[in-house]
From Swiss-Prot:
PROSITE patterns: IG_LIKE. Belongs to the immunoglobulin superfamily. This is Junctional adhesion molecule-like. Residues 20-132, 137-250 form the Ig-like V-type domain. Glycans are attached at N76, N231. It is a single-pass type I membrane protein. The Ig-like V-type domain 1 mediates interaction with CXADR. The Ig-like V-type domain 2 may also play a role in the interaction. Disulfide bonds join C42-C116, C155-C234. SUPFAM superfamilies: Immunoglobulin. The keyword Hydrolase does not apply. Transmembrane protein of the plasma membrane of leukocytes that control their migration and activation through interaction with CXADR, a plasma membrane receptor found on adjacent epithelial and endothelial cells. The interaction between both receptors mediates the activation of gamma-delta T-cells, a subpopulation of T-cells residing in epithelia and involved in tissue homeostasis and repair. Upon epithelial CXADR-binding, JAML induces downstream cell signaling events in gamma-delta T-cells through PI3-kinase and MAP kinases. Expression is restricted to the hematopoietic tissues with the exception of liver. Expressed in fetal liver, spleen and thymus. Preferentially expressed by mature leukocytes (at protein level).
């Protein structure tokens, strides 16, 4: 008589003991971003068909903070409390002893340890389970991409319970376009389904990059066009539970400023026409370079000769008293040299005003031998004045 009773009580006591010891074992952890949702499981396994009488969810922020109520369930009534109103819901099946909690629009202050307590009707024992929630900064809801580039749009639903994703759907809505299905995944087909072009212009440009078994429905959009700018809404279905997330995509027509990467440092391969043009330019430059040098030299020589001629003419005009005076020194046979003074303008320095005399230079002009006798006769006549010939000649 007592054996069946022992067999019934033993699993129940084991279940209660496991539930109480869940706090001693390291609890599961969830990491979510600000603004996302988190599903914290609290499932009580029991062999008896007893209904849940009460469920309490509390938050323990830390050592120096007080615990606060999140939600409580009593007599088929679920009541969120305090700052968690409109953000928490019981998503489990109460009839199946499932008191899982869905926390939406997660805030930084929501970080901490969440404790679930389940009481069955007519039982004094309490089943407890803890979940540690870590909160990260908010992910950008607006993304920027350039035309022709690629962009990854994330969509992850964090949950402690292992639930199969039944459906993943991405819907696009632009400013000038109606809603259009971008990507759809069915769990029954066990394959991703991309719509043909008749369904939209995303065909062959969207790939699933997330892990469906981890509730990750992220996609990659390639070959971005200007018309791709708009809102992208992701929906992850876990049975009756639906998680949604919206991303705004901005498309810029400008080319991105590429960073210096090893791929960018690869040598550029020139085409046939470009190579011919470059070789032609180099050859023409080499051939024309000597001609340009000769032209420059000739131009400089002409300018110098013209300048010297103008200088001599200007000197004669400014000093008309300058005449050729004979000099009677014979330096070679058959010709004489006549020295005439050339007066050069005085150079005045700004720092030291000088009173230097004008410099005098002598120029030699050849005299033909036929004029030698006439010159000698004139010298003999002048020497009759009583001065020595050498001095007069000098």
């Amino acid at each position: 008589m007592f054996c069946p009773l022992k067999l019934i009580l033993l699993p129940v006591l084991l279940d209660y003991s496991l539930g109480l010891n869940d706090l001693n074992v390291s609890p599961p952890e969830l990491t979510v971003h600000v603004g996302d949702s988190a599903l914290m499981g609290c499932v009580f396994q029991s062999t008896e068909d007893k209904c849940i009488f009460k469920i309490d969810w509390t938050l323990s922020p830390g050592e120096h903070a007080k615990d606060e109520y999140v939600l409580y369930y009593y007599s088929n009534l679920s009541v969120p409390i305090g700052r968690f109103q409109n953000r928490v819901h019981l998503m489990g099946d109460i009839l199946c002893n499932d008191g899982s909690l869905l926390l939406q629009d997660v805030q930084e202050a929501d970080q901490g340890t969440y404790i679930c307590e389940i009481r069955l009707k007519g039982e004094s024992q309490v089943f407890k389970k803890a979940v540690v929630l870590h909160v990260l900064p908010e992910e950008p809801k607006e993304l920027m991409v350039h035309v022709g580039g690629l962009i990854q749009m994330g969509c992850v639903f964090q949950s402690t319970e292992v639930k199969h994703v039944t459906k993943v759907e991405w819907i696009f809505s632009g400013r000038r376009a109606k809603e259009e299905i971008v990507f759809r995944y069915y769990h029954k087909l066990r394959m991703s389904v991309e719509y043909s072009q008749s369904w939209g212009h995303f065909q062959n440009r969207v790939n699933l990059v997330g892990d469906i078994f981890r509730n990750d429905g992220s996609i990659m959009l390639q070959g971005v066009r200007e018309s791709d700018g708009g809102n992208y809404t992701c929906s992850i279905h876990l049975g009756n539970l639906v998680f949604k997330k919206t991303i705004v995509l901005h498309v810029s027509p400008e080319e991105p400023r590429t960073l210096v990467t090893p791929a960018a440092l690869r040598p550029l391969v020139l085409g046939g026409n470009q190579l011919v043009i470059i070789v032609g330019i180099v050859c023409a430059t080499i051939l024309l370079l000597p001609v340009l040098i000769l032209i420059v030299k000739k131009t400089c020589g002409n300018k110098s000769s013209v300048n010297s001629t103008v200088l001599v003419k200007n000197t004669k005009k400014t000093n008309p008293e300058i005449k050729e005076k004979p000099c009677h020194f014979e330096r070679c046979e058959g010709e004489k040299h006549i020295y005439s003074p050339i007066i050069v303008r005085e150079v005045i320095e700004e720092e030291e005003p000088s009173e230097k005399s004008e410099a005098t230079y002598m120029t030699m002009h050849p005299v033909w031998p036929s004029l030698r006798s006439d010159r000698n006769n004139s010298l003999e006549k002048k020497s009759g004045g009583g001065m020595p010939k050498t001095q007069q000649a000098f």
